[in-house]
Curated annotation (Swiss-Prot):
Binding site for L-methionine: E55, Q98, D247, K278
Organism: Clostridium botulinum (strain Langeland / NCTC 10281 / Type F)
Residues bound to ATP: H14, D172, G173, K174, R238, F239, D247, R253, K254, A270, K274
Segments passing through the bilayer: none
Major subcellular site: cytoplasm
Entry's Gene Ontology molecular function annotations: ATP binding; magnesium ion binding; methionine adenosyltransferase activity
UniProt name for this protein: S-adenosylmethionine synthase
InterPro entries: ADOMET_SYNTHASE_CS, S-AdoMet_synt_C, S-AdoMet_synt_central, S-AdoMet_synt_N, S-AdoMet_synthetase, S-AdoMet_synthetase_sfam
Gene that this sequence comes from: metK
SUPFAM superfamilies noted in UniProt: S-adenosylmethionine synthetase
Domain of life: Bacteria
GO BP, sorted A to Z: one-carbon metabolic process; S-adenosylmethionine biosynthetic process
Length: 391
C-alpha cells in the first residue's frame, strides 16, 4: 500500500521561531546563573517591536533587552532594509513572579505532603497534561523522514545565507517535504516546497536554480528523487517582505515543527521559555528518550508513548504505549519495561537528563528531536542494553 505524508519546517528567521529563540535565550541566561530559577517566558514580535512577558522567579539578574537584541542579531536581522533591525527595534518587558499557588505544588509534591516520599517525590509536576514521545527506525535519527528532511533543508537555507553562498537570501523561510511510503517504509520524495525571503534585486529564475543546486542537491539523497518529484520554490513568485514585518510572531506557535511534523501525536504544550519543572517540556523530552531507546533496542519499529501528569503530583497518572502493529511484544509488556527502566517523576527526569542547564536555545530552531549536530541528553541511546535485559 502506498501513501503520502507531508511535514514542514521553518528557518530561525521565521517570526514564530524568533520568539522561541528569545524565550529560550532568557531561560538559558537565568539557568546559567540560577539553575533552580523558575521561568515561563513568552515573546511576541511585530514590525519594529518585541514584547517579552511571563512569570520568572530567580535570585539572579539578566538584561532581557540585551539578550533580545543579541538573539535577533545572531539570526541575521541586523539592518533596516531587512524589515527588522536588532539595533532599532523597541523591546518591551512585562515580567511577574511565578504564582505562589503553582510554586506550592512544584516545591512540595502531594506525595511529600502525605509523607509517602523519597527525595525525588519532593518535586511535583508543574502542571497537568499529557505529553507524547515518538521514534521510528525509518531514519538513522529515529525520526520520521518528512520532518527530518524538512529540518535539514531549513538549516541548509540558513547556512548558505550566513556563509555567503547565496548572499541575497534573508532570514525568513519555510520548507515542506512530502514523502511517499510503501508498506510503511519511505521509498521516494514526491514533493519539496521551499519559500525563502530574498533581496529585491534577484529574480525567481535565479532563486530556483540556486536553491536546487546549493540546498536541495546537497541535502536530499539523489536516490529519493526522480523525474516525478515536484519542486515548488517561492511559488508566490516573490518573497521580499518577511520576518516580523510580514507576519507577527509568538512563542509556542510551531509545536508540530518542534516535534514530529504531525507524524506522532502532540499533547498541546509548547516547549520554549519553560524551565524543566514544566512537564510540557521535560516530560516530552523524557518521552522521546524512552521511545528512541525502546526502538533502538528492537522492541518495535515504530513507537509512541504517552505520559500524563497532575499538577503538584510527582508520579505520572498514566503511561500508555502504541507500536502501530510493529511491536515485538505486547504494549502492556512494553509499559512494564518502561516502569522498570525509567523513572518518570519530574525530579528524576531533571536529574537523569541533567536539565537544569542552559541547553535550550540551541534547540529552539530546527527541531528539538533527532538532532545530530548537537549533543542533547534526551537523544542519547544510553538505556538500550538495560532494556534488552527485560525483553
Amino acid at each position: 500500500m502506498r501513501k503520502l505524508f507531508t511535514s514542514e519546517s521553518v528557518t530561525e528567521g521565521h517570526p514564530d521561531k524568533i520568539c522561541d529563540q528569545i524565550s529560550d535565550a532568557v531561560l538559558d541566561a537565568i539557568l546559567d546563573k540560577d539553575p533552580n530559577g523558575r521561568v515561563a517566558c513568552e515573546t511576541a514580535v511585530t514590525t519594529g517591536m518585541v514584547m517579552v512577558m511571563g512569570e520568572i522567579s530567580t535570585k539572579c539578574y539578566v538584561d532581557i533587552p540585551k539578550l533580545v537584541r543579541e538573539t535577533i542579531r545572531g539570526i541575521g536581522y541586523d539592518r533596516a532594509k531587512y524589515g527588522f533591525d536588532c539595533e532599532t527595534c523597541s523591546v518591551i518587558t512585562s515580567i511577574d513572579e511565578q504564582s505562589v499557588d503553582i510554586a506550592m505544588g512544584v516545591d512540595e509534591a502531594l506525595e511529600s505532603k502525605k509523607g509517602e516520599m523519597d527525595r525525588l517525590d519532593a518535586v511535583g509536576a508543574g502542571d497537568q497534561g499529557m505529553m507524547f514521545g515518538f521514534a521510528t527506525n525509518e531514519t538513522k535519527e529515529y525520526m520520521p523522514m518528512p520532518i527530518e528532511m524538512a529540518h535539514k533543508l531549513s538549516r541548509r537555507l540558513s547556512e548558505v545565507r550566513k556563509n555567503g553562498t547565496l548572499p541575497y537570501l534573508r532570514p525568513d523561510g519555510k520548507t515542506q517535504v512530502t514523502v511517499e511510503y510503501e508498506n510503511g517504509k519511505p521509498v521516494r520524495i514526491d514533493a519539496i516546497v521551499i519559500s525563502t525571503q530574498h533581496g529585491p534585486e534577484v529574480y525567481l529564475e535565479q532563486i530556483e536554480k540556486d536553491i536546487k543546486e546549493h540546498v536541495i542537491k546537497v541535502i536530499v539523497p539523489s536516490e529519493l528523487l526522480d523525474e516525478n518529484t515536484k519542486y515548488f520554490i517561492n511559488p508566490t513568485g516573490r518573497f521580499v517582505v518577511g520576518g516580523p514585518q510580514g507576519d507577527s510572531g509568538l512563542t509556542g506557535r510551531k509545536i508540530i515543527v518542534d516535534t514530529y511534523g504531525g507524524y506522532g501525536r502532540h499533547g498541546g504544550g509548547a516547549f520554549s521559555g519553560k524551565d524543566p519543572t514544566k512537564v510540557d517540556r521535560s516530560a516530552a523530552y523524557a518521552a522521546r528518550w524512552v521511545a528512541k531507546n525502546l526502538v533502538a533496542a528492537g522492541v518495535a519499529d515504530k513507537l509512541e508513548i504517552q505520559l500524563a501528569y497532575a499538577i503538584g503530583v510527582a508520579k505520572p497518572v498514566s503511561i500508555s504505549v502504541d507500536t502501530f502493529g510493529t511491536g515485538k511484544m505486547t504494549d502492556e509488556e512494553i509499559v512494564s519495561i518502561v516502569n522498570k527502566v525509567f523513572d518518570l517523576r519530574p525530579g528524576a527526569i531533571i536529574r537523569d537528563l541533567d536539565l537544569r542547564r542552559p541547553i535550550y536555545k540551541q534547540v529552539a530552531a530546527y527541531g528539538h528531536f533527532g538532532r545530530t549536530d548537537i549533543d542533547v541528553p534526551w537523544e542519547r541511546l544510553d538505556k538500550v542494553e538495560e532494556i534488552k535485559k527485560h525483553i
